[in-house]
Amino acid sequence: MSALAPITGTLKKRIITDIVIGFSLGGVMASYWWWGFHKNVIDRREAFYADLAEKKKAEN
């Protein structure tokens, strides 16, 4: 009998932990990219084309 209890299931727990952490960080980074960067670029582009349409409408 050893003084230490055998370590069982460590690999399975580690794999599950790594997968959960990976998906969580991936989701956070994707959300940051979408709401922090992408939406600002799209809003700027839409404002540009709306302004351009107003200028063309005023010319005619």
Swiss-Prot record:
Enumerate the propeptide ranges: 58-60
User: Which residue intervals are topologically Mitochondrial matrix?
Assistant: 1-15
Q: Name its cellular compartments.
A: Mitochondrion inner membrane
Organism domain of life: Eukaryota
Q: Which GO terms describe its cellular component?
A: mitochondrial inner membrane; respiratory chain complex IV
Membrane as a keyword?
Answer: yes
Keywords per UniProt: Cleavage on pair of basic residues, Membrane, Mitochondrion, Mitochondrion inner membrane, Oxidoreductase, Transmembrane, Transmembrane helix
Q: Which GO terms describe its molecular function?
A: cytochrome-c oxidase activity
Tell me what topology the record assigns in the membrane: Single-pass membrane protein
* InterPro entries in the record: Cyt_c_oxidase_su7a_fun
Q: Which residues cross the membrane?
A: 16-38
| An annotated GO BP | mitochondrial electron transport, cytochrome c to oxygen
Q: Where is the signal peptide?
A: none
Q: Which residue spans belong to the Mitochondrial intermembrane compartment?
A: 39-57
Q: List the pathway annotation.
A: Energy metabolism; oxidative phosphorylation
Keyword Cytoplasm included in the entry's annotation:
no
Q: Quaternary state and partners of this protein?
A: Component of the cytochrome c oxidase (complex IV, CIV), a multisubunit enzyme composed of a catalytic core of 3 subunits and several supernumerary subunits. The complex exists as a monomer or a dimer and forms supercomplexes (SCs) in the inner mitochondrial membrane with ubiquinol-cytochrome c oxidoreductase (cytochrome b-c1 complex, complex III, CIII).
Family in the record: Belongs to the fungal cytochrome c oxidase subunit 7a family.
- Function description: Component of the cytochrome c oxidase, the last enzyme in the mitochondrial electron transport chain which drives oxidative phosphorylation. The respiratory chain contains 3 multisubunit complexes succinate dehydrogenase (complex II, CII), ubiquinol-cytochrome c oxidoreductase (cytochrome b-c1 complex, complex III, CIII) and cytochrome c oxidase (complex IV, CIV), that cooperate to transfer electrons derived from NADH and succinate to molecular oxygen, creating an electrochemical gradient over the inner membrane that drives transmembrane transport and the ATP synthase.
Q: By what name is this protein known?
A: Cytochrome c oxidase subunit 9, mitochondrial
Q: Which organism is it from?
A: Candida glabrata (strain ATCC 2001 / BCRC 20586 / JCM 3761 / NBRC 0622 / NRRL Y-65 / CBS 138)
- Which gene specifies this protein's sequence? COX9
